[in-house]
Structures are given as structure tokens and as C-alpha cells.
Amino acid sequence: MTVRVAINGFGRIGRNVIRALYESGRRAEITVVAINELADAVGMAHLLKYDTSHGRFAWDVRQEREQLFVGDDAIRVLHEQSIDALPWRELGVDVVLDCTGVYGNREHGEAHLAAGAKKVLFSHPGGHDLDATVVYGVNHHELQAEHRIVSNASCTTNCIIPVIKLLDDAYGIESGTVTTIHSAMHDQQVIDAYHPDLRRTRAASQSIIPVDTKLAAGITRIFPQFNDRFEAIAVRVPTINVTAIDLSVTVKKPVKASEVNLLLQKAAQGSFHGIVDYTELPLVSVDFNHDPHSAIVDGTQTRVSGAHLIKTLVWCDNEWGFANRMLDTTLAMAAQGFR
């Protein structure tokens, strides 16, 4: 069965979902029937074809009236401001991928269902009232048919949760801290300009900028046992893609750095193949651009202090890896059937 998908919001994640779908060869499993985006179709086609981070899209892209063509595949383009006006029932939409970054609560999900979609997947963290929050590779097997409004968590949650699970299963985590070193994002300024967050009034290309993060809440959403045992901070750096996460955890069992690396390397080759990767090459952030994994462990940076404090560095392409997980989760939701 081919899953009929609509994309609501055609920004960084929405466009990368399309590119990942075509580049990964999953068009027999997923068909995009519509895209809803307030911007004009000419701009949509141009930004899908030409991307500063990911290069030129190999597929032919063209726009004809209110249709976007990728190769010979026609995708209807919509410009609706209200979810209520979206023709999901008419288009036979199975799953809406809401990539707006704006919507994310149950009310918004219910609006998509009322418009005719069978299920909804948000590309960002949602409220506690959603049916499920999924980190693919860790808890996607818990999806059920009645889970109709789902969050795919965040790119950083998808990056760090698999590593936390591996370390906790092996050594027993007592507590931890996380520092996200994240590329600049659309909510920052090119030059100094007004923003409610005074730090984000400053030019993104000229400073390392501390920002708020809800990553600790994202960790406890997946692993409630870590409530009040993880803290997180985040800084934005003057790069346009790829993120590094510094994870430090105290564990119950004594361990050596070499043992931690062996554990993570084996997981990358085995149970987490395709989700977690492992490297000891002397790489820098740009080398992980367009990497489809949720997490790439940098084994050269693993440290252990006092046998119980583990520090690891984990990379991710915060756009491309996450877009691939959106596709994975879509198929996992569809596999549970539609009511």
C-alpha cells in the first residue's frame, strides 16, 4: 500500500522531506499528493531545486500554475491559512506531515483530522495531550492504530535519545547534562534587529548565541524515569547546518572510555544500524552535512572521569537526518492501519 501524504509547511523540514523521499527511493511507499504553503509556487519550486546546505536537487523540478512537478509526479499546491480549509478528505490524505513549526497541540491535530486526514505527524515537539511522541529506533514499536496525532519530537531529541538509551541500558544513568551546539536557525537575525529574545536581536553570523532549549523536557518525555535528573543548555553558532551535542552522564557501573566506544560502535553496526553511526575519523561539522543518521558518535571525543562520569560528542545533520526520520515514522504509523 502506498501512503498518501500531504505536507503542511514547506520550509527547511518540509522541503527536505520531499528531497529525502526521492533520494531514498521510497516513492513506492509514500506519495506526496499536496503541499500547503503560504509562499508562492514559483518560490517553492526554486527553493526545492536549489538549496544552500544540500546542493542542487537531482530531480527535475518545475511549477505549472498551482502544481509542483518533481520528475513526472504532480503535487497540488495550496495556500490556505486555516487548517479547516484544507481539502484533505477530497485528496484522500492518509497522513499529514505538519512541518510548519507553528502548530503542535491536539487542537491543531484534531483540525487536520476534521479536514479529512486519517493521521497527523508534527515535525516538532507537541503537547502532552498528543497520542504519542516518537523517536524512531527507540520507541516507534509502541505505536498503535489509535495513535492518530503524533509528534516526531525534535532533531536534537532524535539525536541524543538513542545514545542515552544505550548508555542507560549498559551502565545505568543516574543523571546527566546536555549542551547543544546548534547551527543558526530562521528565528535569528542576519543583522542586528528586534526580537523578543534580546540575544536573538544580534547578527547570527557574528556571535555564539545562548538560547533557551526544551531538550531536557524532550528527554523526560521519552524516558519519564529521568524527570529532574537531566538538564540542558543550548548555543547557536555561525554555521547554517549540522549540530553537535555534548552529553555528560553519571552512571552506576564503573566503565572505561574504550568500553563506551565499543558499545556505541556495536550498536551502530547492529540494533541501531541506520539510526546511529560511529566514527573515529578527524572530521568537522561540514563532513556530516546530508548524513541521514539521527546521531553520529565521535569516538575520538569520548572521555570517562572517575570511572562513572561519561562524556560523549554526538553529531547530527539537524535537517537531513530528521527529515529521514519523518519518513520512517510516517511508514510506522501507516503500518498500524487507518480507521
From Swiss-Prot:
CDD domains: GAPDH_C_E4PDH, GAPDH_N_E4PDH
InterPro entries on file: E4P_DH_bac, GlycerAld/Erythrose_P_DH, GlycerAld_3-P_DH_AS, GlycerAld_3-P_DH_cat, GlycerAld_3-P_DH_NAD(P)-bd, Glyceraldehyde-3-P_DH_1, NAD(P)-bd_dom_sf
Record's keyword terms, sorted: Cytoplasm, NAD, Oxidoreductase, Pyridoxine biosynthesis
Taxonomic lineage of the native organism: Bacteria, Pseudomonadati, Pseudomonadota, Gammaproteobacteria, Enterobacterales
Pathway: Cofactor biosynthesis; pyridoxine 5'-phosphate biosynthesis; pyridoxine 5'-phosphate from D-erythrose 4-phosphate: step 1/5
Protein name per UniProt: D-erythrose-4-phosphate dehydrogenase
GO CC terms in record: cytoplasm
Similarity comment: Belongs to the glyceraldehyde-3-phosphate dehydrogenase family. Epd subfamily.
Keyword NAD recorded: yes
